[in-house]
């Protein structure tokens, strides 16, 4: 009998969560899924995901992504190496940059990378009435209609630079991050979702604690902090946007 993949914790304090989101426009929901399903998702990301890459080096550069199987070829692998070096240069000059491992749930679903596989089922769960109902209740946004998403792994030396997520015209209303890394993540290992004020000070930071769901209204200035070379594991997550169209 297959293991359940995505079951919400039935004891979530929905009214309290909605109050906090209305107050600050961001929150972290701990123990959002049942322990069993969160562990199953973590195993899928750690052991059953064909990881590609996502890279951008400068605000004027276009995001670059590559599927895992393409990275086995010499020419694309060399291009990835050069683009990673470019992200160092961009970040050093105070320009926007990011690099991390990625698997697009939406592209995989539409292009039938693994039809009926766990990643397809996960995207369906993210758009099912149970999850979308929780999201509408917590955010106070009854017009949310769908969720997109991708799996991400911020491994050693990966980061996401400060930016806004200002794609309001595309229907982005709320960003979400479902954290699925190891249980005892340590602060020195980075990978925090942080929010900045206008002076560049950090207002709030969320540890990527296992089985927690970060939600924040967009646009807000935020980043994912650098994961250092001594981090023992990657920061696994499912991320995306809740949309009104």
Identify the function of each model-found stretch.
Residues 1-214, 219-245:
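Fe(II)/2-oxoglutarate oxygenase catalytic core
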């Amino acid at each position: 009998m297959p293991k359940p993949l995505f079951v919400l914790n039935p004891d979530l304090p929905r009214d309290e969560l909605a109050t906090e989101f209305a107050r600050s426009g961001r929150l972290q929901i701990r123990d959002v899924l049942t322990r069993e399903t969160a562990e199953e998702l973590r195993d899928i990301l750690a052991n059953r995901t064909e990881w590609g890459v996502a890279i951008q080096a400068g605000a004027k550069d276009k995001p670059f992504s590559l599927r895992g199987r393409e990275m086995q070829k010499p020419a694309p692998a060399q291009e990835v190496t050069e683009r990673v070096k470019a992200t160092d240069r961009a970040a050093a000059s105070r320009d926007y940059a990011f690099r991390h491992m990625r698997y697009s749930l939406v592209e995989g679903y539409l292009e039938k990378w693994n039809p009926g596989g766990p990643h397809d089922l996960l995207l369906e769960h993210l758009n099912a009435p149970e999850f979308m109902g929780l999201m509408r209740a917590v955010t106070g946004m009854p017009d949310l209609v769908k969720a997109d998403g991708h799996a991400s792994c911020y491994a050693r030396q990966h980061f996401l630079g400060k930016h806004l997520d200002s794609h309001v015209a595309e229907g982005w209303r709320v960003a979400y991050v479902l954290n699925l890394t190891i249980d005892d993540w340590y602060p020195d290992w980075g990978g925090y979702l942080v929010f900045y004020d206008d002076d560049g000070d950090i207002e709030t930071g969320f540890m990527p604690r296992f089985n927690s769901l970060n939600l924040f209204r967009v646009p807000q200035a935020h980043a994912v902090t650098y994961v250092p070379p001594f981090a023992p594991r990657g920061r696994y997550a499912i991320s995306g946007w809740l949309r009104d169209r």
